């Protein structure tokens, strides 16, 4: 942890409502966010990723609805220069068009290329980052890409040798069989992808991975299994992911009390490598007094302690986020603060009455033992739009 005698690293927080991306200052000591200014994208923000230099932010946007909803026609990556003192954003170059809705964007380790995941149809493409840091042309791939079903995230391993496409598949319904999920692993060489292996236990049955993160110093990868509400750990070797699950844990506080659809979400490892965090999401509604109200379930952050010898994750806390559906969350680079973002306003029962829980941001302090202490919420009026992404970017020292 950062001691009181060390300077707290500065970071800017960015959160969207539809196509608008707003910057907030982050006051770690007081666990406060201060709203500043807003830039507007060509369409709704889907995800964003900073350049390794921390001086540019690449934002994926789309006019498509989420999931398998209405398909739009506007899909782009837009670059912004980050003011190193304040975090203010200034558009840098022209947006580049994409073929369909980008669900996730990241860069390789040196930020020479952008990797973009698409959910419908499932896919991954690589785009050069130009010498002037603007997004550039697509990298031609030598052969077909095995992109699975419903890609949700793409990441390059810390050694820059593999790219991993997290493909969730789809849960089964009374009228449609389950679509299998998988981790699609590719050799990665300067933007060129080559199929290596599909990690899909039992053929991907009951395996719906959504999001992963890497330990900062050890060869350990943590993956949330959205459709089974699990957190799993994989061991890594140079240029290889061991295909067997090393450790598996529940994400829910009450895995035997599923009140409505639960979905494990984002995963982030603490900067000190001692803890890993995951999101639990629920938003299903039922009719009550002529209104749709929250059916119940866990909207929480689960905290795991990481065994520093084995990498095994052990749950030590579940804490409610105070709002509904924490789609994204992020840890401040100081390791002392977490912020969670929530998509939409939802009606909830309050005794015999009904009240609305607004979309917005929840702020938590992170204690030395890794546990979270709730600090405050910020309501955000999303109108007919939604919050979809939030993240913090360290500013250059």
Feature roles, as predicted:
Residues 38-42, 94-99, 142-147, 199-205, ...:
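Surface loop/turn motifs at the tips and blade-to-blade linkers of beta-strand repeat domains
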Residues 9, 44-46, 101-103, 150, ...:
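Beta-rich catalytic cores
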Residues 88-158:
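Asp-box/WD-like beta-propeller blade repeats and closely related beta-sheet repeat scaffolds
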Residues 7-9, 51-54, 107-111, 158-160, ...:
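Residue-level detector of Asp-centered blade-edge/turn motifs that repeat once per structural unit
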Residues 24-31, 79-87, 126-136, 185-193, ...:
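Short loop/turn segments immediately following beta-strands, especially the blade-tip
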Residues 15-17, 66-75, 117-122, 172-181, ...:
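Short, solvent-exposed loop/turn segments at conserved positions within beta-propeller repeat blades
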């Amino acid at each position: 942890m950062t001691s009181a005698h060390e300077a707290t690293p500065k970071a800017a927080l960015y959160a969207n409502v539809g196509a608008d991306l707003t910057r907030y200052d982050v006051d770690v000591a007081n666990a406060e966010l201060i709203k500043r200014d807003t830039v507007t994208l060509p369409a709704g923000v889907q995800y964003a990723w900073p350049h390794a230099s921390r001086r540019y932010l690449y934002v994926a946007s789309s006019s498509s609805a989420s999931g398998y909803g209405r398909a739009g026609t506007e899909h782009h990556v837009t670059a912004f220069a980050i003011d190193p003192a304040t975090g203010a954003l200034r558009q840098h170059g022209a947006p580049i068009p994409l073929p369909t809705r980008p669900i996730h964007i990241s860069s390789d380790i040196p930020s020479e290329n952008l990797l973009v995941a698409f959910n419908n149809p499932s896919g991954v493409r690589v785009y050069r980052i130009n010498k002037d840091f603007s997004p550039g042309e697509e990298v031609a791939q030598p052969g077909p890409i095995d992109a699975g079903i419903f890609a949700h995230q793409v990441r390059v391993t810390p050694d820059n040798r593999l790219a991993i496409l997290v493909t969730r598949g789809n849960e089964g319904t009374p009228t449609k069989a389950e679509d299998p999920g998988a981790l699609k692993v590719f050799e990665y060489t300067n933007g060129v992808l080559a199929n290596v292996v599909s990690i899909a236990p039992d053929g991907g049955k009951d395996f719906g991975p959504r999001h992963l993160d890497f330990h900062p110093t050890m060869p350990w990868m943590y993956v949330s299994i959205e459709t089974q509400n699990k957190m799993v750990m994989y061991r890594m070797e140079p240029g290889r992911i061991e295909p067997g699950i090393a450790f598996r844990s529940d994400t829910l506080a009450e895995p035997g009390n599923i009140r409505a659809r639960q979905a494990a979400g984002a995963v982030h490892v603490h900067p000190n490598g001692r803890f890993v965090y995951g999101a639990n999401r629920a938003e299903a509604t039922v009719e009550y007094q002529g209104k749709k109200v929250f059916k119940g379930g866990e909207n929480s952050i689960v905290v795991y302690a990481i065994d520093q010898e084995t990498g095994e994750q052990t749950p030590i806390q579940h804490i409610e986020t105070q709002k509904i559906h924490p789609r994204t969350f992020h840890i401040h680079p100081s390791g002392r603060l977490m912020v969670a973002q929530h998509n939409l306003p939802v009606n909830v029962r309050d005794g015999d009455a009904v009240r609305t829980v607004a979309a917005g941001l929840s702020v938590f302090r992170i204690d030395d033992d890794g546990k979270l202490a709730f600090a405050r919420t910020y309501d955000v009026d999303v109108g007919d739009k939604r919050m979809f992404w939030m993240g913090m970017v360290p500013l250059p020292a």
